[in-house]
Swiss-Prot record:
Residues 407-420, 512-529, 543-556, 621-630 have a biased composition (Polar residues). Its main location: host cell. Residues 633-648 have a biased composition (Basic and acidic residues). Keywords: Host membrane, Membrane, Transmembrane, Transmembrane helix. This is Uncharacterized gene A8 protein.
Length: 683
């Protein structure tokens, strides 16, 4: 594989220069365009290096598997992987030695390529134009100020404050390292042209990474700039080391030089507190472990609570980093260069990422989520995205039926109340209707004890797709599921672990020109299921009117008393799932949409399941609705039409008799799959 092919097989590729010195040990350092990656149990970093110009590594590949952060496991491995600082990029570096200057390289073809495949399955490549440089003269440090205080090295990183410089100025920075086995230096010019500057200075003969950071709040020429130099220590076993740092303005009339001989190294990382478990998301479809993911906007639900975390997103040309300050509040965080990506992060676990840029179909967007404390999870998405076409939050696009839940609960002993926020639907006739179920937020005090009474009220607005009568049924079922409950059946019945409540209220939509009345009965046995008259096997004949009302609405209220220790203490309500499925009402078919939101309790979760059964379309004759509990229709449940009715009535009836049981069975299986997926995504 040549250098170009290797680079093309990377998700992210950077270009730069690799400098080396003849007859001297040189360090080729690859700096990853990413924040510092965490320590992982059994993390694998696959590192490949190839060069066409260096004698001792010409046309060779070095593949490192099971590379760990820090020193390599095997001394013969030429590449070392390490993390500089707690938040700074990780680096992969290679020590090379070119013993002879007789080897000449073509400046147009002398290249080196390093490829790193990280534990998130993101590939990073650096393509270097290789250049040889002459050794620099040893710096005169006789006039430098020797500092007796310690120079701390925390997690292989040191930061040294420079004297104040000014915007639009240029100065020179030099670094010298003297140790028992190393004595060399490097220097570079730094130009402060922007409010924020981060200049990397290549030091090929030093096992150091050197960069200068500067920032100012004033863009006027001559404004004071705060500057510092960051030193990354690649080697950890240096003895009798001293570091000299000097800086001077462009006119060289002034020079500030400091020597540090007391270098103290510490490592603040506690491995047991910085372990990560990786969860791969290879595509939009399929099992996503602890995550839910939808397009436009990207919705990433992280099911575990975490007070501090990082969210890292990359496209091909830039990287973005968000970090939660752990202040316990919802925060919209933006940083670095993210012109096409914004993120809203809730410390209660929900992350919404909006991608609005003109990403091409061939572009990759890498999405990585890192939690910073404890054994948390990380995920990655490598997928091409197009600009977002969804409306802003809080609005409903044409063809979207939205039911939004807002939980409001006081800390005194009162009932938590579900307050519906209805949304109008304006679907033109014949277009697909969509039921969109979203959850609001509940901010009750953790562990506050409330009366064991919960009232749930849902309001749904529906636009019929034709002037004929449409009848729909909305079914609400409540149950409690323990937090450690992994799988449930569609009925959510698990003996000894789940308290299942019967359906206590049902309603229907009608085209009678007025809002239908909810049918509410007392809770009965599961066989009776509190069915309203609409769903009884003996239909009541009615005269169908072709009303031209805009929409019909209905409200379903459920009042029930919860018992048991697992449901009488309210925790917090967090957004859980937004499940969107298309519904196209068709005569004689059932369509079921399941959505749920979660009310977290101390030892259990309260799930609200919404089942929407699409309308039967009646055309001058009576048709009973199928029983949604069984998701099937018996032939004897349908009345026979009298003679003299529509000539196609008998054929239509026989069609429904055979079609409905098949459709019911199919959609029962669909409901089972949706419920299980929804529950997995809320874990």
């Amino acid at each position: 594989m040549d250098n170009y092919t290797l680079a093309l097989n990377c998700n992210h590729t950077t270009h730069g220069y690799a400098h080396y010195v003849y007859s001297t040990l040189s360090y080729l350092v690859f700096i990853g365009n990413a924040p510092g990656y965490p320590n992982c149990e059994n993390c694998i970093y696959d590192i490949t290096f190839n060069s066409t110009s260096m004698l001792n590594i010409s046309n060779n590949y070095f593949h490192i598997a099971n590379a760990t952060l820090g020193a390599p496991e095997y001394p013969e491995q030429p590449v070392t992987l390490s993390v500089i600082g707690e938040e700074s990029p990780w680096v992969a570096w290679l020590a090379v030695h070119t013993p002879d200057k007789n080897y000449t390289e073509d400046a147009n073809t002398a290249r080196a390529v390093m490829r790193v495949l990280d534990p998130f399955n993101i590939s990073w490549c650096a393509v270097y134009n290789v250049q040889s440089v002459d050794p620099t003269d040893t710096q005169d440090i006789s006039n430098c100020t020797e500092v007796s205080e310690e120079l701390p090295v925390n997690n292989q990183k040191s930061s040294i404050h420079l004297n104040t410089y000014f915007l639009n100025s240029t100065f020179t920075v030099s670094v010298s390292l003297n140790a028992s086995n190393i004595s060399s230096q490097c220097s570079g010019n730094v130009s402060l042209e922007n409010m924020t500057s981060n200049v990397h200075i290549p030091c090929p003969t030093l096992p150091l990474t050197v960069s200068v950071k500067a920032s100012t709040d004033n863009m006027q020429t001559g404004a004071a700039v705060n500057a510092s130099i960051d030193i990354g220590w690649l080697l950890q076993n240096l003895t009798d080391a001293s570091l000299t740092v000097s800086s001077s303005p462009g006119n060289l009339t002034q020079k500030n030089c400091t020597t540090y001989k007391n270098i103290s190294k510490t490592d603040r990382h506690v491995r047991d507190e910085n372990l990560y478990v990786l969860a791969q998301i290879p595509a939009l479809e399929g099992h996503k472990d602890s995550f839910t993911l939808t397009r436009s906007p990207i919705l990433l639900n992280f099911s575990r609570n975490s007070s501090e975390f990082q969210l890292v997103l990359y496209d091909r040309n830039s990287s973005c980093v968000w970090a939660n300050p752990a202040n316990g509040t919802d925060t919209i965080l933006v940083s670095m260069s993210c012109p096409h990506i914004t993120a809203t992060i809730s410390p209660r676990g929900e992350i919404k990422v909006n991608v609005t840029g003109n990403f091409s179909r061939n572009a990759n967007l890498s999405l990585a989520f890192l939690s910073s404390k404890g054994k948390e999870y990380a995920g990655v998405l490598l997928q091409a995205f197009e600009p977002s076409t969804r409306p802003p939050p809080g609005t409903v696009a044409p063809g979207i039926l939205s039911t939004t839940a807002n939980f409001e609960t006081s800390t005194n002993k009162s009932s938590p109340t579900y307050t519906p926020t209805p949304a109008k639907l304006s679907t033109p006739p014949g277009l697909t209707n969509t039921l969109l179920l979203t959850a609001g937020e509940h901010n009750s005090g953790i562990g506050s004890t409330l009366e064991p009474l919960t009232t749930v009220s849902v309001q749904v607005l529906q636009t019929p797709s034709s002037p004929t009568r449409d009848t729909s049924t909305l079914v609400i079922k409540l149950t409690t599921v323990p937090q450690d409950h992994k799988t449930v059946s569609p009925s959510l019945v698990t003996p000894g672990r789940t308290s299942t409540l019967p359906i206590v209220s049902m309603t229907h939509f009608s085209r009678e020109g007025s809002s239908p009345k909810p049918q509410t009965t007392a809770a009965k046995t599961s066989s009776e299921a509190s069915l309203p008259p609409l769903l009884t096997t003996t239909p009541t004949p009615t005269n169908t009117e072709k009303s031209q009302s805009t929409f019909a609405s209905s409200t379903v209220s459920v009042d029930t008393t919860f018992t048991g220790d697992d449901v009488n203490t309210v925790g917090t309500m967090s957004p859980s799932i937004t499940q969107t499925l298309p519904i196209t009402p068709t005569s004689g078919r059932q369509y079921i949409v399941v959505g749920c939101c979660t009310l977290n309790r101390r030892s259990g979760n309260l799930f609200f399941f919404f089942l929407f059964v699409a309308a039967h379309r009646e055309s001058g004759h009576n048709t009973s609705m199928p029983n949604p509990h069984h998701n099937s229709v018996k032939p004897e449940d349908h009345p026979h039409h009298p003679e003299g009715d529509h000539p196609d009535a008998d054929h239509h009836e026989r069609f429904q008799i055979w079609l409905l049981p098949i459709a019911g069975t199919i959609f029962a299986l669909v409901a089972l799959v949706i419920v299980n997926i929804a529950l997995r995504m809320t874990e």
